[in-house]
From Swiss-Prot:
One of its GO terms (cellular component) is extracellular region. The presence of a 'disulfide through disulfide knot' structurally defines this protein as a knottin. It is found in: Secreted. Probable ion channel inhibitor. It comes from the Eukaryota. The keyword Acetylation does not apply. Expressed by the venom gland. Disulfide bonds join 49-63, 56-68, 62-76. Residues 1-21 form the signal peptide. This is U20-theraphotoxin-Cg1a 1. Keywords: Disulfide bond, Ion channel impairing toxin, Knottin, Secreted, Signal, Toxin.
């Protein structure tokens, strides 16, 4: 039972790597899609807003879906909304 589970996980891992490589080759990109999405998330400096746990004085200082928490020290935290 354990061996069949390990073999199944290994096969799924190989299939994931193989399809990711095929997708990467198809798009002609040098970065995986998940890395590009992470870059978009962390581009707070270009948007003139504070990222998660960044210092703030009002809600407008924080990025989208973040709000300024007034507890000391003040910081940007998730405002419980979804994109």
């Amino acid at each position: 039972m354990k061996v069949s589970v390990l073999i199944t996980l290994a096969v799924l891992g190989v299939m994931f790597v193989w399809t990711s490589a095929a997708e990467l080759e198809e798009r002609g990109s040098d970065q995986p899609a998940w890395l590009k999405s992470l870059e978009r998330i962390f581009q707070s400096e270009e948007r003139d807003c504070r990222a998660l746990y960044g210092g703030c004085t009002k809600d407008e200082d924080c990025c989208k879906h973040l709000a300024c928490r007034r507890t000391l020290p003040t910081y940007c935290a998730w405002d419980l909304t979804f994109p």
